[in-house]
Amino acid sequence: MIQRIFYPVGQGAFYSERHENCNIVYDCGSMSISKGRKVVSQRFSKEDIIDILFISHFDYDHISLIEDLKATVKEIRFVVMPLLHHNEKILLFNVSSI
């Protein structure tokens, strides 16, 4: 059985699917960090393993809660990101280093 959840984070995207042996998260963000953090803390725990985290694109309201999710769960095994051109990779690396 598949359990699909659309989390109430306001403007943003944060969904998950729980299969028998696989947990998947699609995007992980919200413009309202307080709403998003509440969802992360209520719906995930240190026992949870996210097998795959899919990121559709890098808008703030799709990625702003990734650090919170990472700090809350035991492990995120794989991250799937959109195809990036060379200049986008450089920009992403430089922004993440700040």
Give short role names for the model-derived ranges.
Residues 1-44:
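Conserved beta-strand hairpin/beta-sheet module of binuclear metal-dependent hydrolase folds
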Residues 28-30, 58, 84:
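Structural motif
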Residues 35-81:
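Active-site metal-binding motif and surrounding structural segment of the metallo-beta-lactamase
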Residues 72-98:
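Flexible, acidic/histidine-containing loops and adjacent segments that form or flank the divalent-metal
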